[in-house]
Amino acid sequence: MSDIAIIVSLLSLVAVLGLWIGHIKIKGVGLGIGGVLFGGIIISHCTHLYGIELDAHTLHFIQEFGLILFVYSIGIQVGPGFFASLRQSGLKLNGFAVMIVGLSGILVALIHKLFDVPLPVILGIFSGAVTNTPSLGAGQQVLTELGGDNITAVMGMSYAIAYPFGIIGILLSMWLIRIIFKVNIDKEAQEFDNNQNQQKEGLDTLNVRLTNPNLGGLKLKEIPDFESHTVIYSRLKRNDQLIVPNVDTVLNVGDVLHLVGEKATLRKMQLILGEEADVSVSTRGTIFRSERAVVTNENVFGKKIRHLMLKGKYEVVISRLNRAGVELIPNGEMALQFGDVLNLVGRQEDIETVRAIIGDAHQKLQQVQMLPIFVGIGLGVLLGSLPLYIPGFPVALKLGLAGGPLVVALILARIGSIGKLYWFMPPSANLALREIGIVLFLSVVGLKAGANFLDTLLSPEGLAWMGYGAIITFIPLIVTGFVARIYGKMNYLSLCGLLSGAMTDPPALAFANEIKDGHGAAALSYATVYPLVMFLRIILPQLLAILLWTAS
């Protein structure tokens, strides 16, 4: 067999064995994708015994390309919600997540200095203790550029030794917080639901009868606050006739307008227009319909709604716009993106015409456009290679192959589309790309680390590494958990999601979800902090490597 055939065969064997190990669960908890690392260690131990040598350059390429695929697909997945998570609603959660990341970084520096732990070892322990594989890749890359030797094998071993308690430690933290604070799960779930219902302010509807005589005879566009684009006038009922209004529709006293917008804004418009009307403005039994259609036609990507002139040409109103699960007011200045779901109101034939214009080809939502993927990866690698020179640092700081593709993916996913290129990826395709990437990366890390893993694990040095990892895992979680619970008054279920997200640990999230079956509190806080934490976990090992290398 050729060298390439041997490597591919061994990688397949590692993946099969590792994924099988990852599926083994003890009381509902398993290694998950981390099992691939241990599969690689086992196979590497066997190849070492039989003297099988694998080409280092080929393995290095596979490892780096797998890492790129993994972080890029993560960025595309979380990009639409990343910037939203930094707004007011997520500041508290993200603040505590940053606290966990910061404390772990401080502990790494202290352990490195106090116990004279080699830099590659402590960075590998750090990555394993926080169960974050991309941080391992980032640390390996920056240490290689700093001139370190035998980086991959040493970091891989220390990562693997610290990894198991990284998973166990977060579950132990959740359990201890629950016991110490005597948490009542049902009560916490009820309080969370009540709080969510109070805060939730999506789009609402209101029927208003025009009784203000000053507005009679005016065109719709002449109504006060019409230009603010905070309310959609989707239907108008005059006597028994239903009309789809446009900007030039003349209003009469007694007309009933169907408004769509946020509750506070609707009440404000009611004060201007008249009184709430207990009248049905439904399209049932009329020539009008209200239907949904999805934007898939590349010719309208990036076009503003007003440029389509749907009201003027086709007498069709867009009453709602759903983008990545968030309902938005579809004002004329809003640019359409691939995957936007529009609620259309108008005659059936007019809606069909508009449907043809915007696409509404649902099969396209399941297709993967490959060109944008490689454009994004290429731009990410370029960004990751750009040096940032900081006075006093021996090497330039770079985002690297882990950070560059992640940042570019976050930005491109937020933008949505540029011309005919769109960065939407079906969830199934994104998951497949992400899993392939992480399996390739962990397989190679395991193959490189496995030769001396068992000897190291059973040595006093290996036991010390496990202890350092336990400290880095446990202390930031328990300290932040106590602070968030006592001073932040954080809901326990949300706190469990926060701890899982701060460690970017899906098995921990699965455990948190099982605390209260069918409740989404943990998943919501996990998703809120995950994007920022993933970014910080990739940047932090690079900063630590440069700072500690410079100080030594």
From Swiss-Prot:
Residues 190-275, 277-360 form the RCK C-terminal domain. One of its GO terms (molecular function) is monoatomic cation transmembrane transporter activity. One of its GO terms (cellular component) is plasma membrane. It comes from the Bacteria. Its main location: membrane. It is found in: Cell membrane. SUPFAM superfamilies: TrkA C-terminal domain-like. It is a multi-pass membrane protein. One of its GO terms (biological process) is potassium ion transport. InterPro entries: AAE_transporter, RCK_C, RCK_C_sf, Transpt_YidE_put, YidE_YbjL. Keywords: Cell membrane, Membrane, Repeat, Transmembrane, Transmembrane helix, Transport. The chain crosses the membrane at residues 4-24, 29-49, 65-85, 95-115, 161-181, 370-390, 402-424, 438-458, 463-483, 492-512, 529-549. Belongs to the AAE transporter (TC 2.A.81) family. YidE subfamily. This is Putative transport protein APL_0966. The lineage of its organism: Bacteria, Pseudomonadati, Pseudomonadota, Gammaproteobacteria, Pasteurellales.
